[in-house]
Each structure stands twice: as structure tokens, then as C-alpha cells.
């Protein structure tokens, strides 16, 4: 069993970790990597690059901002303003995932201790 799990973990990609640990959907991962590879962009620019509609990209960006994977800044235009989005680097994503895994590990250890002490 242990060997099976270790072999599966060796095949994990950063996308798998983002899906599993951060709970991201495919479109959110796609938007993140689009920003990482192509640089910053507005909702409409990103939507065009990932071939999805504006509202889908807006939802993905909101989710990515909530996870700390995307930042935005407000740009004033002749008529109104727009937001420009930028992906944080992969080192920061790794830090976020590591922090979440550490928290999860500590919680599982507490739960197992509780389970052992209270199973009778």
C-alpha cells in the first residue's frame, strides 16, 4: 500500500496539487498558467487567450485571487477603469500549498490522537 501511494505521488504535477490541495477547477488552473506564461491581462484579454467567455474568466480570477494566486491593479482609462490581473510566481504557489499541507498534517495527527483515545 505504501509503495503504491509513493508511486502515485511521484507522478503528481503542480496542476494536480493545485486541483487537490487548493480545490481549483480546470479553468482556474488554465487561467493561472495563461497569466504566468503570457503576462498580465484584462478579463477580456485573458478570455480571448483561453477561449472562454468573460463571466467564466471573471469567476476563475475571483477564485484565484481568493487563493492568493492572482493579484490585480486598477487602471484608469478615458472612460472608466479596468482591472489588470497578474499571476504570482510558482514559488509563492508552492509556499501556499506547503502551508496548507502542514496545517492539514497537523489536523490529521490531532484527529488520529483523538480517535485512538476515544475509540473505546
Curated annotation (Swiss-Prot):
Please name the Pfam families in this protein's record: TrmB (PF01978)
The residue ranges crossing the membrane are none
InterPro entries named among the record's database cross-references: ArsR-like_HTH, TrmB-like, Tscrpt_reg_TrmB_N, WH-like_DNA-bd_sf, WH_DNA-bd_sf
Q: Which residues form the signal peptide?
A: none
Superkingdom of this entry's organism? Archaea
Q: Which CDD domains match?
A: HTH_ARSR (cd00090)
What family does the database annotate? To M.jannaschii MJ1503.
Q: What is this protein called?
A: Uncharacterized protein MJ1082
Starting at the broadest rank, the lineage of the source organism is: Archaea, Methanobacteriati, Methanobacteriota, Methanomada group, Methanococci
Amino acid at each position: 500500500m505504501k509503495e503504491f501511494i509513493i508511486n502515485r505521488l511521484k507522478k503528481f504535477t503542480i496542476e494536480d496539487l493545485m486541483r487537490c490541495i487548493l480545490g481549483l477547477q480546470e479553468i482556474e488552473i488554465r487561467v493561472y498558467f495563461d497569466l504566468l506564461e503570457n503576462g498580465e491581462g484584462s478579463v477580456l484579454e485573458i478570455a480571448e487567450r483561453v477561449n472562454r467567455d468573460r463571466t467564466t474568466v471573471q469567476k476563475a480570477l475571483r477564485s484565484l485571487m481568493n487563493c492568493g494566486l492572482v493579484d490585480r491593479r486598477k487602471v484608469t482609462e478615458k472612460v472608466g477603469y479596468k482591472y489588470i490581473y497578474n499571476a504570482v510566481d510558482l514559488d509563492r504557489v508552492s509556499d501556499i500549498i506547503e502551508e496548507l499541507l502542514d496545517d492539514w498534517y497537523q489536523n490529521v495527527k490531532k484527529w488520529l490522537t483523538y480517535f485512538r483515545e476515544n475509540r473505546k
